[in-house]
Curated annotation (Swiss-Prot):
Allows the formation of correctly charged Gln-tRNA(Gln) through the transamidation of misacylated Glu-tRNA(Gln) in organisms which lack glutaminyl-tRNA synthetase. The reaction takes place in the presence of glutamine and ATP through an activated gamma-phospho-Glu-tRNA(Gln). HAMAP family: GatA (MF_00120). It is an enzyme of class 6 (ligase). InterPro entries: Amidase, Amidase_CS, Amidase_dom, AS_sf, GatA. PANTHER family: GLUTAMYL-TRNA(GLN) AMIDOTRANSFERASE SUBUNIT A, TRANSAMIDASE. It comes from Pelagibacter ubique (strain HTCC1062). GO terms for molecular function: ATP binding; glutaminyl-tRNA synthase (glutamine-hydrolyzing) activity. This is Glutamyl-tRNA(Gln) amidotransferase subunit A. Keywords: ATP-binding, Ligase, Nucleotide-binding, Protein biosynthesis. GO terms for biological process: translation. Pfam families: Amidase. Its EC number is 6.3.5.7.
């Protein structure tokens, strides 16, 4: 096997099942590449020695009926992993070792996968560039000095750099789709309630959703099949008939109606994004789809709505971090002083900003003017999508308003950073599924993605559309391994 790490998940599983490669051989290959790639800063915690032991154990008693037989995988450090440090990219959780496993990761281990380690992310998933992490920013494998996107930046970087064959992220306002777009990979944000939130460090509970990130759509479908289960431990988990997404995957989308929302043609959109969208429409037509112009009139208000609702929920969720039961604790002269010092020293500046925004909009004098109004607008945004889906089967948009930007370019301009999520946040507010697929490059050769948005619980449909378009686009990620000396 020339280069195990460059294989897709589907290829890797086939080779392991055909006994062409062992789990130990596979795991060693990913560990070796991981050790050579530390300059990317993708890992917060490496669990390489345990991974090798588990791989050897699997090879001694293999079970090839499993969907991920002995496959090594690294996951975002927002998922609780029993007895393995889970930090959420924050100083305040730097010493936290969970006594339990998240449902999503448990589903993955149940299918035979092996944990390689925990991947870097923006602190508490608050960020669009992986620059807010206490453990330092992540480099994109696309080019030196480039952000990989966020908050699942470590996941996207590790995937594109072939440090893991697949991975999982979380998406609150675009945190799977935006980094996937920036790194030339595939990222699916499932319907809210499709994947359990149990054991995921919470940011905004009505928006957070776990999802798969992969090298191609087929791998994405397989991982979604594994992680999407009903869970009684999560009150927002929804019990519905789930598809066998990978088995039901088809490139036949003839006659599907795909909507193009006129409101997404925003002022100042770069020509390369306009051109990408136009090409995407042509690809969809070539696949046999019918293009329909639609209107989503209230999505213009999605960004301000999101940046009221999400910080409000974050300020409530993060109130639990006080230094008493677990995590970082600062010394204080009394209890109140200890609380103040722990939180001011333990949280980074972006997290503090969002806590303050959230506390403000929930305060008695401003609750009606901001939070309540935002929830009403959120309902209108959901209604816009409901109306659109009376005419179309899916919606096609760009994933992001630009290609990846340089590290440090937007750190002093929060509004500019927040605008990165302009095409992704409406989906979270409406609780819908959406997938980003690589579809082209800009003038510098940086990847650009297209987003396909579906009806609630219609992941199969958007996976099929993505699969058909992927075949037409024939995107090839150009990674030069610039970071390996």
């Amino acid at each position: 096997m020339s280069d195990i790490t460059s294989l897709t998940l589907t290829e890797l599983v086939k080779n392991i099942k055909d006994k062409k490669i062992s789990s130990e051989e596979t795991t060693k290959a990913f560990i070796d590449r991981g050790e050579k790639s530390r300059d990317l800063n993708t890992y917060i915690t490496e669990d390489f020695s345990n991974a090798l032991l588990k791989a050897k154990s699997f090879d001694q008693k293999p079970n090839f009926d499993l969907k991920l037989p002995g496959v090594p995988i690294a996951v975002k450090d927002l998922f609780c992993t029993k007895d393995v440090k889970t930090t959420a990219g924050s100083k305040i959780l730097n010493n936290f070792i969970p006594p339990y496993e998240s449902t999503v990761t448990q589903n993955i281990w149940n299918e035979g996968a092996i944990l390689l380690g925990k991947l870097n992310c923006d602190e508490f998933a608050m960020g669009s560039s992986n620059e807010t992490s206490f453990f330092g920013n992540v480099q994109s494998p696309i080019d030196k000095g480039l952000v990989p996107g966020g908050s699942s930046g470590g996941s996207a970087s590790a995937l594109a750099a072939n440090l893991t064959p697949i991975t999982i992220g979380t998406d609150t306002g675009g945190s799977i789709r935006q980094p996937a777009s920036f790194t030339g990979t595939v990222g699916l944000k499932p319907t809210y309630g499709s994947c359990s939130r149990y054991g995921i460090v919470a940011f905004a509970s009505s928006l957070d959703q776990a999802g798969p990130m992969s090298k191609d759509v087929k791998d994405c479908a397989l991982l979604q099949e594994i992680i999407s289960t009903y869970d009684e431990k999560d009150s927002t988990s929804i019990d519905f008939k789930r598809n066998e997404y990978s088995k039901e995957l088809t490139n036949n989308i003839k006659g599907k109606k795909i909507g193009i929302p006129k409101e997404y043609r925003v002022d100042g959109m770069p020509k390369e994004i306009e051109d990408l969208w136009t090409k995407g429409i042509e690809y969809a037509k070539d696949c046999g789809a019918e293009i329909v112009e639609i209107s989503l009139p209230h999505t213009n208000y999605a960004l301000p709505t999101y940046y009221i609702v999400a910080p409000a929920e974050a300020s409530s969720n993060l109130a639990r971090y006080d230094g008493v039961k677990y995590g970082f604790r600062s010394k204080g002269e009394n209890l109140i002083d200890m609380y103040e010092k722990t939180r001011s020293e333990g949280f980074g500046s972006e997290v503090q900003r969002r806590i303050m925004i959230g506390t403000y909009v929930l305060s008695s004098g401003y609750y009606d003017a901001y939070y309540l109004k935002a929830q009403k607008v959120r309902k209108l945004i959901k209604n816009d999508f409901d109306e659109a889906y009376k005419k179309v089967d899916a919606i096609l948009t760009p994933s992001t308003p630009s290609a990846a930007f340089k590290i440090g370019e937007k750190t002093n301009d929060p509004v500019s950073m927040y605008l990165n999520d302009i095409f992704t946040v409406p989906v979270n507010l409406a609780g819908l599924p959406a997938i980003s697929i690589p579809a082209g490059i800009d003038v510098k050769g940086y990847p650009l993605g297209l987003q396909i948005i579906g009806k609630a619980f219609d992941e199969q449909n958007i996976l099929n559309i993505a699969y058909a378009m992927e075949e037409k686009i024939q995107f090839k990620n150009k990674i030069t391994d610039w970071w390996i000396k």
